[in-house]
């Protein structure tokens, strides 16, 4: 049987299912009546499980934390780990973010590539094998996570709380081809400062710690407008991402900063609007107060830096490359200012090195610190069975030759398992659109995903 040919018979149906899946706005909200990540995520999970059920597969919903679609027999299990939760859509979309609109051979929408498109491709690859009655030695389980973009409570619930056994072998279609052999560590923390002076200031930037913010704004009182205007004009010279202002009430002026959104793991693909705002404020803001203290901190330790150089964290190793840092959010609520950091650190770097340096900076500027999460790096030998098998499948299906496994700054579910790596679903020649405005799935690439994943499931499950 020519599996790559057979699976393409499902292409049209799979694309329609993806369009419908994108329409389910699955951004995390607070817990509600048996929906730990909010009702929207629950509805999306039910949609994906229902697809599996209609295909005649066994489906299980584990209390709306995580879903499972399974087929086949066998003592051992091949696991496929995907997720259907998405990051907030942000602003400035050309196409509606939750409509699944198809334009010029691309289906647009939040989650189209991260990660609903790849999940659908894997599901229809499973359906193809099932419909053809192809006998596999392992059973195949597609796990559908609902909290990948935040705290991984879905995975913790499945493996830690429910104590489910790990699959003997697994992959996650939530990164980039050809195959990922190492993933950097992910360390997220907040710096917090409290002062009654903050009650008079509105400050807001960013929507997610792991996204590069594209807007940030601050409202200040009793500002000299002509001085502000000339400072902005001077600052904006030869800059692509600019600062703007407007008067919003008598004596109150709002200052806006532009940036470019990107995934926080690839900060170099974006331009950070929060850092841009504070670079400007350093030149303009003169009052001696707690806000000035925060501006000075940005100037000394952050500027527009994304490599942690200013913070004294610069580090590089051969396996995984440079450390990177993203300031994902900043907010003032009542008397509390909070800055959210996302550090991606190389596999050979020790977390205690990072903590020692950050603690020094924290003390210098009298911040409190809250650790949000740490995920240890992942490293698999390039010649391991899993990495080398996936590499050869990729070469066979695409016809590319001499490709090498790569390292990833992003974090995938792979690091939650003993024998799992990320495999796709973005092709190397494709720009990353995850977490960005006008995220899409290219429909020609989608066909290639069907072909790659049907071969992958067939080979790994035998």
Locate the predicted segments by residue:
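Acidic/His- and Gly-rich active-site-bordering loop/insert found
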Residues: 1-110, 131-136
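Residue-level signal for inorganic ion chemistry
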Residues: 21, 25, 220, 277, ...
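An extended, acidic, His-containing surface patch that forms the Zn2+-binding/catalytic region
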Residues: 50, 258-261, 265-334, 344-349, ...
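Active-site metal-coordination/substrate-binding segment of hydrolases
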Residues: 77-144, 150, 163-164, 436-437, ...
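Acidic-glycine-rich active-site phosphate/pyrophosphate-binding loop
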Residues: 87-103, 187, 191-193, 247-257, ...
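Acidic/histidine-rich catalytic neighborhood of metal-dependent amide-processing enzymes
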Residues: 115-195, 225, 229, 233, ...
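Buried hydrophobic packing segments
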Residues: 119-129, 158, 220, 277-281, ...
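Acidic-enriched catalytic cores of C-N bond-cleaving enzymes acting on peptides and small amides
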Residues: 181-190, 195-204, 209-260, 264-324, ...
